[in-house]
Amino acid sequence: MDLGDRAEDSTIDFKFPTRNVSAAPATLAGTPVISVYKANGTTESVAGVTLTVDFDGKTGMHHVRIDTSADAFYAIANDYDVVITTGTVNSVSVVGYPVASFSIENRFTNVNQINDVPVIGVGTSGDKWRA
């Protein structure tokens, strides 16, 4: 799941499911850990990551919060992958399962458009001139 391009030092919240072989919701067990990988690197971090298994008492629905202000690991102009690095579902390892991705200020922003309308200039009264 793509969580989009985020602002520096933001907090990211998302949920993800786990299911057993018959597709029924199942608990993420085995002292689960969610880690974050930066760019194309093999270094993972758990800084600022909080995992709540079976969120709100709902089996198989898990909540992750990532506080990107928690560590210098989270830097602008980078892409990140969120991965299960420890855990099982029905005694089967789910290590390496990617659950989300995001970036921090790493996407092109077209400053020549306002509300998806190409703009050459904006007047003092707020009028827009189309290109």
Locations of regions flagged by a protein language model:
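Polar, enzyme-active/binding microenvironments
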Residues: 1-131
